[in-house]
């Protein structure tokens, strides 16, 4: 994201608001959700809405990306895939796979920024996407300390869920069939499921 591209996105948001409000009925006052990078899209440059106090903000967070979604090492990607996140979960066996950014303090600061910029100004916020990949023995990359890797994923999920709720953000875990089998109504990844639930307590 850049200031220039965010300006284009804001113009799209304005078109969206105008189109919805113009249809009348409940769409006159329906809450509308805007997405964008929190560094550039702020209440001060929100598009104009003729209905006051009916805009919400959606935020996605996959930090640190090298831990949550990165699939390949350099030279294919810009960083190495990281297996270990959080205090007490770093590996002494393969330290090159430890996270080097995006750990608790940095993520906490991000939540506080969003709270200050949006929640404290009365703008509802959704954490519309967050999740972390979990490696296993059949993965392309196999952590040498699998227990620490699994705990890293558990702790990240719980942390993100808990901190979201603590500052008034509603979290929505990004789930594409790896955690739940919606056809048979069963849980496929009990650890991730339990980690989400733990974050709500």
Annotate each language-model stretch with its function:
Residues 1-102, 112-133, 166-167:
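Active-site region of glycoside hydrolase catalytic domains
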Residues 9-15, 107-111, 151-158:
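Well-ordered, non-membrane alpha-helical segments in soluble/globular domains
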Residues 40-42, 103-104, 180, 189:
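Alpha-helix initiation/capping motif
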Residues 47, 137-201:
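Aromatic-rich peripheral "rim/lid" segments of glycoside hydrolase catalytic domains that contact
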Residues 101, 109, 146-147:
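Short secondary-structure boundary micro-motifs
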């Amino acid at each position: 994201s850049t200031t220039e591209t965010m300006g284009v996105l804001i113009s799209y948001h304005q078109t969206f608001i105008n189109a919805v409000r113009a249809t009348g009925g409940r769409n006159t006052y329906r809450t509308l959700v805007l997405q964008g990078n929190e560094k550039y899209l702020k209440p001060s440059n929100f598009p104009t809405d003729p209905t006051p106090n009916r805009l919400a903000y959606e935020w996605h967070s996959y930090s640190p990306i090298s831990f949550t979604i990165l699939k390949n090492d350099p030279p294919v990607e810009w960083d190495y895939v990281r297996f270990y996140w959080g205090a007490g979960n770093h590996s002494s066996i393969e330290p090159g796979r430890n996270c080097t950014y995006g750990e608790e303090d940095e993520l906490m600061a991000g939540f506080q920024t969003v709270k200050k910029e949006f929640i404290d100004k009365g703008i509802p916020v959704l954490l519309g996407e967050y999740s972390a990949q979990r490696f296993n023995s059949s993965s392309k990359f196999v952590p040498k300390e699998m227990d620490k890797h699994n705990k890293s994923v558990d702790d990240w999920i719980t942390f993100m869920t808990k901190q979201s709720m603590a500052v008034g953000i509603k979290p929505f875990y990004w789930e594409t069939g790896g955690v739940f089998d919606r056809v048979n109504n069963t849980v496929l990844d009990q650890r991730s499921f339990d980690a989400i639930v733990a974050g709500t307590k």
